[in-house]
Amino acid sequence: MQHIIKTALQQTFNYKTNKSIYNILVGKKSHQTFFDACSQQQLSLYHSLPLLKYPSFELFLENITEFNAEMEIMLHPRYTFESMGQTFQAIQLLVQTMSNTMQQDFRFVPISQNNKIQETVKIVYNYIKENKLQIDFENELHNLFKAITLKGPCYLHYYLQGYDEPMYTRQQVSLIEKLSQQQLFEYEMNNLVTMMFELKSGEYTILSKIIMKPTLLNQTYITYTRLLEQFTMEDIAAQQQVKINTIEDHVLEILIKGYMSNYDDYVEQEDQLQFLNFYQQHRGERLKFYKEQFDTLSYFQLKVLIVGFERGDLNVA
């Protein structure tokens, strides 16, 4: 836990409050927290410590100079801790499904009861079977865990479950590896981050189909469906009887969580280039500072561009 908090603190812009750091770690469902996490490339820390109490958080900050970091927590700019965990659960379920069906056992209890995960795995499983890609799947799985191991000790393999092969619990793994469960959690977090980078590398035709995006808030999901139906932001605001600012927050969440990447719809390319050239030299400032330099851009447009840059969707040519 301490390594995670210290990493968040080191990654946080100077003007941000301790409360904003805490909100990211516990996963506060607010659009400001989503933006804070994305703009500081801390999305993979979002909701990583949901049970953390604020007094404990403050106590650690007071004694941070006494804490000697023994490992580095890796970060991912595109996926929340929940979505990384769900992606691994999908891999667990796919491995379980492939292993059991190869033994003609179709009555096994799925390792994950999450409907979204089950639906995704079903699609990928059918894709493998219809295209006779069993060997390709096994090779990708082997290469994935080999790549994770190269970036540091890998413990995720303990949690795979096959036919007549139950998975280990974290307590069992901690005893086997002689690590505390907290140390193990932090190593597993790094394993998940490496896994997500690997899956997006272009080397995993099958397993990349199983990536689980962060979940959208309910009202944001409604806005997302309306945008897909080609309604304008103004139309959606009128339909939902809310201010346009609310829909702007929804759009930012949609971009942050990777459901759309249509930045050109919100900011002209010439404005994008001018701002991003400036931004990469002045990262970590307050929005007001950027607004003073680019008065023709709205705060919403500034946030859109910052999200695109920090996610790696927009680059300076």
Task: Describe each PLM feature range.
Residues 1-317:
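Long, charge-rich, low-complexity intrinsically disordered regions
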